[in-house]
Design a protein with these regions (language model features):
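Acetyl-CoA-dependent GNAT
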Residues: 75-133, 144, 150
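Conserved acetyl-CoA-binding loop-helix of GNAT-fold acetyltransferases
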Residues: 136-149, 174-179, 183
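Conserved GNAT acetyl-CoA-binding A-motif
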Residues: 151-173
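Conserved catalytic-core motifs of GNAT/GCN5-like acyltransferases
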Residues: 162-164, 178, 182-201
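Glycine-rich phosphate/pyrophosphate-binding loop shared by adenosine-nucleotide-utilizing enzymes
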Residues: 43-45, 103-108, 203
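Helix-loop element at the rim of GNAT/NAT acetyltransferase active sites that forms part
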Residues: 60-77, 90
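A short, internal acetyl-CoA/4′-phosphopantetheine-binding micro-motif in the GNAT/acyltransferase core
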Residues: 127-136, 163-168
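A short beta-loop-alpha structural element at the N-terminal edge
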Residues: 46-58
């Protein structure tokens, strides 16, 4: 596990990548002027707080990653009721956001505690999932920008995202997540090796 010495006068975000992964530190706020190839006009998309009523659609987005990728290390798609309970637990303290267009949710992101000890109260772990058919369209960047701003307002100074990173890309895991975070200014600060086993292989 990578560690950083967080301080309130130096805003920095860090993310931990698992499975040959890395913990990354981002300095400052994500630059909204950075654009990527294939980025779409975001004016039609809206970021808002998630509602429990969104659970079914959010679970549909997540289920693809559970069943087809090593992006999440979960083996089985949770039930709708279990997923609702996870959402409720997060919403008690942290922001849980969705991005939608014309009433349809295309992605979601949320924060949670990095560790349970009181001294970690200024640190959060981030999670983000975008409809697999709408990846690399700028939705993730817009979600992260909104989530980061909300967490800043809460006084959070350190952000972590634990992501899978393959030494060699395969059909279950590529390096897109690492590249996405690097594009937003994250930097590697730590690595776990062979810490997750899924699809009969180590990550």
């Amino acid at each position: 596990r990578g560690e950083s010495s967080g301080s309130s006068d130096r805003k920095k975000s860090e993310f931990v990548t698992m499975c040959e992964s890395r913990v990354v530190t981002a300095h400052g706020i994500f630059n909204s002027n950075n654009t990527t190839q294939g980025e779409i006009n975001m004016t039609a998309y809206t970021v808002r707080d998630a509602k429990i009523e969104d659970a079914q659609r959010i679970l549909e987005i997540y289920a693809y990653y559970v069943e087809n990728t090593a992006i999440t290390f979960e083996y089985d798609v949770p039930s709708k009721e279990e997923f609702k309970q996870r959402m409720r637990m997060t919403m008690q303290k942290y922001p849980y956001l969705v991005i939608e267009k014309e009433g349809r949710v295309y992605g979601y992101a949320y924060a949670g505690p990095f560790k349970e000890r009181a001294a970690y109260d200024w640190a959060c772990e981030l999670s983000i999932y975008v409809d697999h058919a709408a990846k690399k369209c700028g939705l993730g960047k817009q979600l992260y920008a909104a989530l980061t701003e909300r967490l800043k307002q809460m006084g959070i100074t350190n952000l972590y995202a634990c992501i899978g990173y393959p030494q060699t890309e395969d059909e279950y895991l590529d390096k897109n997540s690492e590249q996405f975070h690097e594009h937003l200014g994250f930097q590697t600060v730590g690595t776990f090796h062979r810490c997750g086993y899924k699809f009969n292989r180590w990550y």
